[in-house]
């Protein structure tokens, strides 16, 4: 799931 300033994607973890 998207976190912090990440754009909504399938499974992003930054």
Swiss-Prot record:
Any one GO cellular component localisation term in the record: chloroplast thylakoid
Organism: Pisum sativum
Localisation: Plastid, Chloroplast thylakoid
Protein's UniProt keywords contain Thylakoid: yes
Protein name: Unknown protein from spot 119 of 2D-PAGE of thylakoid
Keywords: Chloroplast, Plastid, Thylakoid
Note in the entry: On the 2D-gel the determined pI of this protein is: 4.9, its MW is: 29.9 kDa.
Predominant subcellular localization, coarse grouping: plastid
């Amino acid at each position: 799931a998207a976190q912090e300033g990440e754009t909504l994607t399938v499974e992003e973890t930054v």
